[in-house]
Amino acid sequence: EPEPKPDPEYPVTVGNVTLTEAPTAVVSLSPATTEMVYDLGYGELLVGVSEYCTAPAAAVAKPRMGSAYQPEVEKIKASGATLVLCTVQPTESTLTELQQAGAQVLVLPRADSVEGIKQNYRALGGLLAGNVTGTAAAETVSTAIDSKLAEATAALSRMAAVPDATLLISYPYRMATGDTLEGQLLAQVGFHCSGADYTNWLYPESELRALEPDVIFCAEADEVETVKQSYEYKVVAAVKNDKVMAIDFTAFQNQSLRMFDTLAEMAKFTAAEPAEA
């Protein structure tokens, strides 16, 4: 009898999770891992999502199974899931309960670079679809990421001067700073990040006079009008030229393909000629 050929797809090991075959039922307890599963093309494997999942639309219809901090273990057990995904470490007791129910738990922490995001997709793709197929799916995502970054860079490269961008998490001074991935992405595609010289999402009030954004991106849509009328911002070019845009910040929080789509939209919005009055 000839030896059976080894399966090129499995086993796959990522961290402390080893799968010997493709999972048929997966639960995602973080909005980020949910989006990533769909980005890779394996949304149909999800039998449950977190109560905080809002994207993509298809995920919203899936059964809700709590969150990484408070999973509904009975629902997860009943779903038959063999793999549970999240971005934060569940408690020891939760981990034990899930493992006893036959599910392995993959914690995929937030990345601090584009390469780290791509690695997260590779890890996830491998587990979901195998060493060959899953890695190929992750490469497709990587290519899409690169093309969106190129699109953003191309839009801004047509501008006469490097635009100064404020990515405002909450009015007035909580914004992307130089130490954040968001701040680094702004710089990578050709913005000057307003908070580049500062850290930890905080611009110093004492430096207000130096805050001169050409464009402002508001993570809170309802802050757009506040910003436009505010003492801090009403005098800056961004407001005078109507370059204030609301963005869906969950795209950045989730580090999904949507983040790079959003970045390209931000660049195009900035580079667009102002409408003729």
Where are these regions (language model features)?
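Bacterial Sec-exported substrate-binding components of ABC uptake systems
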Residues: 1-34, 78, 131-166, 211-215, ...
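Structured C-terminal subdomain patch of bacterial secreted/periplasmic proteins
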Residues: 71, 115-126, 218-277
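Extracytoplasmic ligand-binding site segments that recognize negatively charged/polar headgroups
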Residues: 93, 106-125, 163-183
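Alpha-helical, coiled-coil/dimerization segments enriched in small aliphatic residues
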Residues: 51-55, 175-203
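A short, structured surface patch at a secondary-structure boundary
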Residues: 24-90, 197
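Short secondary-structure boundary segments
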Residues: 30, 88-89, 110, 171, ...
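Short helices/loops that flank or line small-molecule/ion binding pockets
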Residues: 73-80, 96-101, 203-215
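A ligand-binding cleft/hinge motif common to bilobed small-molecule-binding domains
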Residues: 90-100, 210, 215-234
